[in-house]
Amino acid sequence: MYRNVCVIAALFCIAAAATAETYIQQDSIARNKQDYAYLVAYTEANYAAFPAIMQAGYGAPYQAMKDSFGAKIGRGEWGIKQAACEYVYWFNAHFDAHFYVDEYLFWQVYKRRDTPDYKHLMNYAPQAVSQRVNRKTWLLRVPSCAGQNPTNEWVAQAVETFLQSGCKHLIIDLRGNSGGSDMIWIPLLPLLIDHQANMPETYWFRNTYANRYSPAMQDWLLAQIANNEDPAPMFLQVGAEDDEEDEAIPAHDARIHISFIIDRKTASSAETILRVARNYTDRDRYTIYGKENSAGAAETGNLFPFHLPNSRIQVFYPTTVSSVFLRDGQQNGAAGIAPDVRIELPYPDTLTDNVDSWVLYIAKRPASPNHLKEGAQQSGQK
């Protein structure tokens, strides 16, 4: 009898444990579904580029993607971390690299699909550099736009030193620069502006309660939208459109040729200076060099974070979007800015505070209109 009771008790414990495990699993799925629903709803309501993407005709594939991922969560095939990464990467890969999940899985698995792991290809730790390369060429390496390494003051002094050097070829190295603030480029603007904008544009803030009252709201942005009374439009203009025909072109030396070096980590504010050149600089005065395109985070900005309620996964999304994005949907926006000349050399062994092999290669090339034709041919061969 005692043995039977023990056996029954043991079986009861096993059954209870199995039942508890089932309940935990079901509870986990329920929480994952809640988090996924929150991610979807928050994105649709607040992500600045979302309306443009839908208006560009991507509603059907988006709905199919959203439903498919939700079903996989419901069946227990995916956890919330994978689902969140898959959902956000759909936008990140096709439209806008500014939308991302702040998780190791996102950066080391999903972004590896389109971004080389440079630290495994070379000694990759770009540092600020301002120095002469040869008699005619100056190198300005700017690894960040965050205003710390380098500072805005350092960049201003570097530009002044270059202008005093007599060099007529400026290499602006943007490899590894994932952005920060556009303010860092102000000292360089007079060197780049040859004419009025080829394509006037402005930025628009997606005017939602969550965006307006986010703790991440910056004072300068709040000042531009604060005077709009509720109910306000879905989008509020941030700054004036850059098509002022009476705005004077700054005096500068038009003999200076500017070469940019980019990689797939060149993003956001680092892409801004490339867009300035493409919009304002005479075409024979600049060249973009690289092996890969830039990151594709050029036409949105002002990132805010939010957390999924159960898992606390953090997602960053842009609250402003360019009028260029709104005009055409930019279905290839995440492809980034393509180099004019794709560098066929191997990656350098070291990219730190040195003059690397790519810089030496560019310094020896003639800065003439012929580089554009040659660059187009090289790009087409890739």
Q: Residues of each region from the PLM?
A:
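A recognition module on extended beta-rich or small alphabeta surfaces enriched in W/G with H and D/E
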Residues: S322-P348
